[in-house]
Amino acid sequence: MTDHFDYDVFVSYRHADPDGGWVRGRLVPRLRADGLVVCVDVDDFRLGAPLILEMERAVQASRYTLAVLSPRYLQSGFTELENVLAEHLGLERAERRLLAVMYERARPRLSMRARLYLDMTDPAGFESAAVKLCAELRRNPDE
């Protein structure tokens, strides 16, 4: 992690299961096991703070925002806001600040489809995808 980021990654996901269970029970523990510092709302958002300000803080304090794509994710205004914040910050700084993994097949909006994302829809391929994701999360956003 570089000095100016508190987190390697802020995970943007839907809380509803199965998304929330997979993120909190499988993805986040795997990232942390690899030594990454992960920001997850349920662990890191301050109690009583305005939610939108906490989203903004998480995006700014993290090297990357990781969108966990699913049909439910794409229907949420909150996750859309997290994406817009990360995309805008990336444009301001000429950096790649938004990454995505496809947890469950879905058709994202055009700006997300224009990005390469990591397919994690096959449980049998989880570990190899996680290795690739961890390596990418260690890179500088301006590379």
Residue map of PLM features:
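Short amphipathic alpha-helical segments
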Residues: V23-G25, F78-L81, M112-R113
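Glycine-rich, charge-decorated loop segments at or immediately adjacent to ligand/cofactor-binding or catalytic sites
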Residues: R105-Y117
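Nucleotide phosphate-binding site architecture
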Residues: R46, L74, L118
